């Protein structure tokens, strides 16, 4: 699960894709993006839905939901958000976190199971520790911007990203989760 959260964090860090140096590829990335990664069948990776706001001055913001559905009533879920400085050179996105946070938002069954199981409590502690580790303050990943400029493929996870649209259903879902957890 450590790898899952680190991968999720890498995707979340996309929040700063336009280059401060004004390179045209970086400028093409400026705007709002929704990225989605579907978990593997072995449940070793999280289903991720991330929203990035990429500013042309090299600053950015992000928020997202990472989850694994264990069964219909048991979902392990984390809400993440943060601010970054970013740069894109030669199809490699690099970013530095300015701040970040992760909040558990598990289903009631998952929260109950974690509360009653020392091993699960330790795993969650390790995940949160990994998330906040200074070693994750700087991340680099390869990117591929599709020719029309409205689609993006990120890193080894091959998360697919698209530009945010008006009345976007994924933005509404994120708003619901982040407004609930205030």
Residue ranges and their predicted role:
Residues 4-14:
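Sec-dependent N-terminal signal peptides
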Residues 17-89, 94-182:
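Lipid interaction determinants
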